[in-house]
């Protein structure tokens, strides 16, 4: 019996998940991850609509070295510049815009931000031009880390679970399209919580499965590609965040300039007496 892992507290209330789609072949636009036997099922939770992938493909191998090359190509600088040149037509432009709108009262303060899974580092690169904050990234793919170095950005080659940050604490942690890639999103958010200062905030983006699934041939969309172990709904994202010790300030569904359906959320770390 498949159980929606985002709802551990409600396990006893879930009898089963509905099969959303059984993939015998990768979607046409999915990057070629050189998977020999492609067999993947996606289940949909009856309670929250959350989508969970079930397969034996070792997606952890994607992020060690080859994910950056397969998903972005060998010429990262070209991809990076292409996104920059899109300006207001890029998803990142609007991400930074809503991010700074939320944190506008802190814009001139000396804050610290940890960006988890920095990828091309375009988010913290854009922020560096506007704010004077301490910006640090953490990224498991060595190719992305090397590229960040060419941009003179501090991106650590590791992941949040490794403990490499030791006793460091941050005002803000951002996870842009990250928690859908891990087996246990709640666990990752709880780890993130530990790296936040007591009045800290978290910013999260995830694919919106509810809206994507309503499109014609929605199961073939990017939101359901093999590297996404979870695809969220507003209800499931809300639960994941609240189970991790945060109070949601803002949670919305948007259609980005790229055509992606995305959920974003701003949340604040709960104080000990609020848990």
Predicted regions and their residues:
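Short N-terminal helix/helix-N-cap motif within the alpha/beta-hydrolase-1
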Residues: 183-187, 214
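A short glycine-rich, Lys/Arg-flanked "PGG" loop and its adjoining helix->strand segment in the class I
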Residues: 186-201
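A short His-aromatic
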Residues: 177-181
């Amino acid at each position: 019996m498949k159980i929606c892992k985002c709802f551990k507290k409600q396990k006893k209330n879930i009898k089963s998940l509905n099969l959303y789609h059984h993939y015998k072949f990768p979607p046409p636009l999915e990057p070629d991850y050189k998977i020999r036997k492609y067999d993947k099922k996606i289940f949909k939770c009856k309670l929250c609509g959350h989508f969970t992938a079930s397969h034996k493909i070792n997606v952890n191998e994607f992020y060690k070295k080859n994910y950056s090359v397969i998903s972005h190509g060998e010429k990262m600088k070209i991809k990076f510049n292409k996104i920059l040149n899109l300006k207001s037509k890029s998803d990142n432009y609007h991400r930074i815009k809503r991010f700074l709108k939320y944190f506008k009262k802190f814009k001139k303060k000396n804050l610290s931000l940890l960006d988890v899974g920095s990828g091309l580092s375009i988010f913290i690169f854009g922020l560096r031009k506007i704010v004077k904050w301490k910006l640090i990234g953490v990224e498991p793919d060595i190719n992305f880390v090397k590229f960040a170095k060419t941009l003179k950005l501090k991106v650590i080659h590791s992941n949040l679970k490794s403990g490499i940050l030791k006793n460091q604490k941050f005002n803000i942690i951002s996870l842009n399209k990250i928690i859908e890639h891990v087996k246990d999103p709640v666990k990752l958010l709880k780890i993130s919580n530990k790296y936040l200062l007591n009045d800290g905030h978290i910013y999260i983006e995830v694919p919106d499965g509810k809206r994507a699934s309503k499109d014609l041939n929605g199961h073939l969309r990017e939101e359901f590609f093999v590297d996404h172990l979870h695809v969220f709904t507003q209800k499931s994202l809300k639960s994941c965040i609240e189970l991790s010790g945060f109070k949601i300030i803002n949670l919305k569904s948007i259609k980005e300039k790229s055509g992606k359906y995305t959920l974003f959320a701003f949340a604040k770390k709960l104080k000990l007496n609020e848990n």
